[in-house]
């Protein structure tokens, strides 16, 4: 009987720990000081960047004009340009668990289907009309959610869900998005499947996508060298 009680107590403890694990790993670690300006040149990194001495960093780490202007929307076949403002471009957000992007779109331009593995995304359309699409997980039957979002309107993308934006208007469009991670990461679905290095074996994609090898090779040729 005593052995049973000990085993039961152990099982309860494990269950409680498992319940806490998702909470403990839900976002970036909390900061332990007011500022931790990232030392991007340090050779020592451990799930982030070490801190520069605050006096040596000046006060520019609190401010950035990086998103004031966008990039060339015709610089790639997607017809969009992403201006990133993560810890690499704004060392002041180190340990703060936030980052931002600005995305500009040509008419008909798209931010291709992609995933942010480490962050929830919330965005606001500044100008234009963007079709925002979100695809749920298998738990939802891969349900597709979408809406045309216009200037001043907002949207949210749960962490890890595939999504895209597409400019359905006749003029350029711009949106700004924020993440609850200093480095949200991005996995572009088409590039991941057909432009990986080294390539995913063609027979794997033939079986997974239910197409012939010629189609797979054609798609791979479109993503050689990235976007």
UniProtKB/Swiss-Prot annotation:
Keywords: Apoplast, Disulfide bond, Glycoprotein, Manganese, Metal-binding, Secreted, Signal
Disulfide bonds: 36-51
GO cellular component: apoplast
A Pfam family that the UniProt record links to this protein: Cupin_1
Carbohydrate attachment residues: 78, 81
Chief localisation class: secreted
Stored SUPFAM superfamilies: RmlC-like cupins
GO molecular function annotation: manganese ion binding
Domain of life of the source: Eukaryota
Binding site for Mn(2+): 114, 116, 121, 163
Function: May play a role in plant defense. Probably has no oxalate oxidase activity even if the active site is conserved.
Family matches, as PANTHER family: GERMIN-LIKE PROTEIN SUBFAMILY 3 MEMBER 3 (PTHR31238)
Family statement drawn from the similarity comment of this UniProt entry: Belongs to the germin family.
Protein name: Germin-like protein 3-3
């Amino acid at each position: 009987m005593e052995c049973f009680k000990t085993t039961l107590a152990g099982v309860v403890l494990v269950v409680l720990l498992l319940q806490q694990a998702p909470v403990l790993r839900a976002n970036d670690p909390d900061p332990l000081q007011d500022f931790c300006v990232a030392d991007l040149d340090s050779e020592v990194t451990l799930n982030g960047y070490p801190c520069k001495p605050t006096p040596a960093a000046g006060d520019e780490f609190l401010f950035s004009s990086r998103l004031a202007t966008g990039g060339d929307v015709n610089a790639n076949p997607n017809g969009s340009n992403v201006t990133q403002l993560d810890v690499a471009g704004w060392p002041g957000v180190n340990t703060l668990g936030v980052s931002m992007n600005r995305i500009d779109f040509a008419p008909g331009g798209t931010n291709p289907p992609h995933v942010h593995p480490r962050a929830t995304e919330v965005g606001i359309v500044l100008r234009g009309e963007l079709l925002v699409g979100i695809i749920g997980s298998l738990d939802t039957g891969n349900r597709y959610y979408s809406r045309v979002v216009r200037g001043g309107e907002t949207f949210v993308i749960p962490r890890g869900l595939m999504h895209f934006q597409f400019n359905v208007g006749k003029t350029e469009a711009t949106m700004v998005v924020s993440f609850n991670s200093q480095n949200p990461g991005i996995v572009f679905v088409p590039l991941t499947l057909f432009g990986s290095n080294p390539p995913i074996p063609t027979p794997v994609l033939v079986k997974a996508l239910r197409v012939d090898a010629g189609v797979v090779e054609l798609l791979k040729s479109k993503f050689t060298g990235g976007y």
